[in-house]
Amino acid sequence: MKQELIERFTRYVKVDTQSDPESNTCPSTQGQWDLARMLVEELKAIGMEEVTVDENGYVMATLPANTDKNVPTIGFLAHLDTAPEFTGTNVNPQIIEQYDGGDIVLNEQQHIILSPKDFPELANYKGHTLITTDGTTLLGADDKAGIAEIMTAMNYLIQHPEIKHGKVRVAFTPDEEIGRGPHKFDVAQFGAQFAYTVDGGPLGELEYESFNAAEAKITIKGKNVHPGTAKGKMINSIKIALEFQQQLPANEAPEHTDGYEGFYHLLSFQGNVEETKLYYIIRDFDREQFEARKAKMKDIAAALAQKYGNDRISIEINDQYYNMREKIEPVHHIVDIAHEAMTNLGIEPKVKPIRGGTDGSQLSYMGLPTPNIFAGGENFHGRYEYISVDTMVKAAEVIVEIIKLFEQKTS
């Protein structure tokens, strides 16, 4: 499996699939189409059936059952796109055999070093084969590692027909990084009763709780007057925007929260005297707290509108996804099976909430309960991203083991 995973993964990351939140197409970028078409050909080549890609770039395929038991159809998903925050153009993966535990020079010319001093978790990977960036791009382990692991697991099952399994569906989806992954996903066509996203981080991650998530767009209109004659006339929209931000609790920001704590995150602040636009994301695991956060932002906007004039402040809040725990709890055995699969392979499951969202957050509310399992990457979305190939092998093995357990547990 190891060489197959390296070969697949290093090939996939060289396709630039950054998604674009400004685009209205699906997929949002041409590169995702390029990878989707490549995967269609590979799925056919390894012997998968019912291989399709629809007009929105969703790739689906079937591994037919080889057992007489009536096993539930399960699915595995990974996403095609990489994060828009950091360049994914001309990714040049570096392979480090038998990592020695020291500094890794990513880019000598630019003095970019991946060091255990900055990233202590590197110590866990001594002796592993690592794949890193060259310091100028992200790597794309999020989530091309998941794609490579699903492909490798399917190929393994096709090559080993003695392993009994039910029907398995796989899907590779666009635009997860900009929150649109499941928007045009056809759950009925996919036809699985349960699924797993292979989109987690380090070895053993198993997640079935995600944030409740919303975005808030605030527009503040000021009044620009020549500063020499501005007394009593000028209204500076930037200052009102600062007033808005200062009324949010300073300690409820991403840099001050972890575990089950929620936050307000000011993602963008653009403006001048005449007009300022603020863009926030709101996150909380608890539904009541989530609703309270949205209400607080509306209350601040209303108070400032009263102070400066109703036509000066507008706020628009849109929900993005909800905590998938609500939909997975009633079918908790799918989490238990993933837990057992890891334990069977000597992996310690690390069950924790996702401080983010996956496609599974939305899919679970669309009728397809979908927890998330590890894919192996570290330091996603930036130049210090890396992955252990040894962990990738374990992820592919967990996929195979989950499929085996579903068959074994069906009478």
Swiss-Prot record:
This is Peptidase T. It comes from Geobacillus thermodenitrificans (strain NG80-2). Zn(2+) 1 binds at H79, D142, D199. GO terms for cellular component: cytosol. It is found in: Cytoplasm. The lineage of its organism: Bacteria, Bacillati, Bacillota, Bacilli, Bacillales. Belongs to the peptidase M20B family. InterPro entries: ArgE/DapE_CS, Bact_exopeptidase_dim_dom, Peptidase_M20, Peptidase_M20_dimer, Peptidase_M20B. Binds 2 Zn(2+) ions per subunit. Its EC number is 3.4.11.4.
